[in-house]
Amino acid sequence: MSLSPASGIGRFYAKSAKIIRFVRLGCTNRPFYHIVVMERRKNQHQPVIEQVGSFDPLPNDYNERLVALNTERIRYWLGKGAHLSTPAAELLGIAGLLPIHPRTYMTAWRNRRTAAEAEASPEKAESTA
């Protein structure tokens, strides 16, 4: 019986480029992601080298999005020269493992601007009425 990828026994070529990225699992309208290390050129449905975390993007009853990270193994693979996909880099930046990704700043700026516009639009409607 073979071991699961979470145990870190995946086969790979030593000189090939590695990437830490999300692999989508779950059902329709209910995504769930594994954060995995795999060879860069492989399809996400190919066998992975190692699973280093998981991410549930839909909020639970307490409005929490659950993330589990094996920071020791992530640091190991980054030390070995593994690349990061943009969503994985954003998540690791929010988690405090890396500097915050610039796209995270842009998303926060857009959200603040949209909230300010939504707040200002009822005031304009009241003043014109």
From Swiss-Prot:
Record's Gene Ontology CC terms? mitochondrial small ribosomal subunit
Matches recorded under InterPro entries: Ribosomal_bS16, Ribosomal_bS16_dom_sf
Signal sequence bounds: none
Pfam families assigned? Ribosomal_S16
| UniProt-annotated location(s) | Mitochondrion
Question: GO molecular-function annotation terms?
Answer: structural constituent of ribosome
A biological process from GO:
mitochondrial translation
Reading the lineage from the top rank, the first entry is Eukaryota
Alphabetically sorted, this entry's keywords are:
Mitochondrion, Ribonucleoprotein, Ribosomal protein
Q: How does it assemble?
A: Component of the mitochondrial ribosome small subunit (28S) which comprises a 12S rRNA and about 30 distinct proteins.
HAMAP family registered for this protein in UniProt: Ribosomal_bS16
Q: Which family does it belong to?
A: Belongs to the bacterial ribosomal protein bS16 family.
Name it: Small ribosomal subunit protein bS16m
Q: Which organism is it from?
A: Drosophila melanogaster
What gene codes for this chain?
mRpS16
